[in-house]
């Protein structure tokens, strides 16, 4: 007579497999992100209205956007979507160590993006482009600033998730939380690609 013996890791994996089916948390997150999409659509509309009403150069002098900084910073943020998804794959397998590793890397990459954005803000303000200096300054800081706040919100979510998986046993609920955070992070990345293309290339 044979007795099947299961390991804790395999038990977690079996329970986590159920996460591939839609659940209320995931559906609720997708609905919320849809409302966030409408919010950013309004910001894009504001930017294009300001651009249409502007006379002369866009952006106006003395604004000089730092494309050489923006490109690598953007590349890092886009790459962070891939590291985030690797964390999701680990969570779906019940691999908490892989989840922590990939999400910590994603956290560092997101922090790099925020630091890069802050660096560009510093130089723009130093050169005379502030939120009150022109219509361009207003729409630039409002659109990128709200996106930056969303990135910071994602970083906070990563920190809480990493702490949660460290101080307690890894559960399907934590795996669900990891997947939900990934939805948010992918959304933030996609929004930035649109903002980057609009701000740095639409003249």
Swiss-Prot record:
EC code(s) of this entry: 7.1.1.9
Signal sequence, start to end: none
Location(s) in or outside the cell: Cell membrane
Residue ranges crossing the lipid bilayer per the database entry: 30-50, 69-89, 102-122, 142-162, 179-199
PROSITE patterns recorded: COX3
Tagged with keyword Transcription: no
Top-tier EC class: translocase
Bilayer topology annotation: Multi-pass membrane protein
GO biological process: aerobic electron transport chain
GO molecular function: cytochrome-c oxidase activity
Record key words, sorted: Cell membrane, Membrane, Translocase, Transmembrane, Transmembrane helix
Alphabetized Gene3D superfamilies for the sequence: Cytochrome c oxidase, subunit III, four-helix bundle
Catalyzed chemical reaction(s): 4 Fe(II)-[cytochrome c] + O2 + 8 H(+)(in) = 4 Fe(III)-[cytochrome c] + 2 H2O + 4 H(+)(out)
GO cellular component, one term: plasma membrane
Similarity annotation: Belongs to the cytochrome c oxidase subunit 3 family.
Protein name in the entry: Probable cytochrome c oxidase subunit 3
Lineage per the UniProt record: Bacteria, Bacillati, Actinomycetota, Actinomycetes, Mycobacteriales
Gene: ctaE
């Amino acid at each position: 007579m044979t007795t099947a013996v299961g390991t804790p890791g395999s038990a977690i994996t079996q329970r986590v497999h159920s996460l591939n089916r839609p659940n209320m948390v995931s559906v609720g997150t997708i609905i919320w992100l849809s409302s966030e999409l409408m919010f950013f659509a309004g910001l894009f509309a504001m930017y294009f209205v300001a651009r249409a009403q502007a006379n002369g150069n866009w952006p106006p002098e003395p604004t000089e956007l730092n494309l050489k900084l923006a490109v690598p910073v953007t590349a890092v943020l886009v790459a962070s979507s891939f590291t985030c998804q690797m964390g999701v794959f680990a969570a779906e397998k019940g691999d908490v160590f892989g989840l922590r590793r990939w999400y910590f890397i994603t956290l560092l990459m997101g922090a790099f993006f925020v630091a890069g954005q802050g660096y560009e803000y510093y130089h723009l303000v130093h050169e005379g482009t502030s939120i009150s200096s022109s219509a361009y300054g207003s729409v630039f800081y409002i659109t990128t600033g709200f996106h930056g706040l969303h990135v910071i919100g994602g970083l906070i979510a990563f920190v809480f998730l990493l702490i949660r998986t460290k101080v307690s046993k890894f559960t399907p609920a934590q795996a669900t939380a990891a997947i939900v955070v990934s939805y948010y992070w992918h959304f933030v990345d996609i929004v930035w690609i649109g903002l980057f293309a609009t701000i740095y290339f639409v003249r």
